[in-house]
């Protein structure tokens, strides 16, 4: 699978981290367990999840400790962001067509 060039990579990354945060909270994974896996402190992990930005090693630790399938998570978010890019492109094209008709 590749990432469509129309997909905003920043939005994609934030969506992946946001879903990871939700899954961590749902699974009741301890921040101290994630922190131990990535050699960070608990507060740093918690803040990174809230900020929707983190290092790859911290993300791997988060999905591992929460028993999340990282490939499935990324695949779902790529598909969602691709669908949003398609919808935006179609809406823009439809708007341009309606202006031409007027």
Q: What kind of region is each of these model predictions?
A:
Residues 1-33:
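A short, Lys/Arg-rich alpha-helix, primarily the initiator
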Residues 1-7, 74-102:
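Short, charged recognition helix plus adjacent turn
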Residues 31, 42, 56-59:
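Helix-turn-helix DNA-binding elements, focusing on the entry/boundary residues of the two helices
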Residues 38-54:
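Recognition helix of helix-turn-helix/homeodomain-like DNA-binding domains
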Residues 46-47, 60, 74:
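Key DNA-contacting residues within the recognition helix of helix-turn-helix
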Residues 51-64:
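Short, basic-rich loop-to-helix N-cap that marks the start of a DNA-contacting helix
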Residues 52, 66, 77-81:
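The DNA-recognition helices of helix-turn-helix-type DNA-binding domains
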